[in-house]
UniProtKB/Swiss-Prot annotation:
Gene Ontology biological-process annotations: translation
Family (UniProt): Belongs to the universal ribosomal protein uL30 family.
Source organism: Rhodococcus opacus (strain B4)
Subunit structure: Part of the 50S ribosomal subunit.
PANTHER family xrefs: LARGE RIBOSOMAL SUBUNIT PROTEIN UL30M (PTHR15892:SF2), MITOCHONDRIAL RIBOSOMAL PROTEIN L30 (PTHR15892)
Name the UniProt record assigns to this protein: Large ribosomal subunit protein uL30
Length: 59
């Protein structure tokens, strides 16, 4: 199965609580931190909520 490389590029200052929760669920705690997650509907939904704060690449 494909994987997604998700990197946080912007700060969570001034964002809504649900966006901060989505980043934490993805495993991102700071700017320039990168995680590799499975490409499934759940992770795609979390990424969609914070699409303006992260970059996504297929691995």
């Amino acid at each position: 199965m494909a994987e997604l490389k998700v990197t946080q590029i912007k700060s969570t200052i001034g964002t809504k609580q649900n966006q901060r929760n989505s980043l934490r669920t993805l495993g991102l705690k700071g700017i320039r931190q990168t995680v590799v997650r499975e490409d499934n509907a759940q992770n795609r939904g979390l990424i969609n909520v914070v699409r303006h704060l992260v970059t996504v690449e297929e691995v």
